[in-house]
């Protein structure tokens, strides 16, 4: 038995599947374009030590890369800020956040149609940052925590909820935990 072509084209499941697939494609293309954009920005960065690079074309520090994560620092970073920023970014690497965040984004892309997935991804990114902050400051004095908080807050970009690139950390920065420890 064959199904007439007209019935197949009007099948609601085909329409729903097409819309879902378009949503997945849009989110994955967004990730790819973001990746290429950041890659171009850091192309001329200069290695200063190990996996730490300095770059004139970025405004905030971040980690970039899945197989070989690198820490990128803006050239405008002051010497007193570097210790805290590098400690934060190295905590991301130790926690393997550079693997977890892209995995979370893939799940978000697949389940984009569920509003709870949007919320879950936003909270996931926030929790990654908060867990990283907790790890860095757990044995620090109150004064060190305050200094750390102020440094990280200086990179906060208001009005951004989802990070600019699903494969990078810190380019927007949700630093709510920092406020708690001041």
Predicted regions mapped to residue ranges:
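Membrane-embedded and juxtamembrane structural elements of multi-pass membrane proteins
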Residues: 4-181
